[in-house]
């Protein structure tokens, strides 16, 4: 990303250079933000939630489940029951096993090439004003980022089948 804005690459986020300070402060948030913007197939996980011994306050919920530590975005739970998210806990009225599909903080080693390229442009777009004081560089990288983002989402979507909607309220109401 630094090369894209005309700076020298860094080998570590540790250090006192302007580029290292900016990268160290912005990198984790930019990556996590990009991971949660779309339901990336490579960043999906399915896991069973642990039922806690905590007792919910009030009468709205009966059970509290612990969300996974690496969860960034909850996609769905199974079985499908009403639930509420409070901090790192899931409150619901089920006491059986609950499974969650979610986006996790996928390590760089698992990123496909299309996502890595998109992240490069996202970083360059956000680094440009802080490191280079260049609005022109930011605008150019923003256009590249938008294109890379579209292509990454398209490529990712081609690898995973579409799950059909199983709920048919208009048909069910007739019978």
Each language-model region and where it sits:
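Glycine-enriched, solvent-exposed interface loops adjoining structured elements
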Residues: 2-175
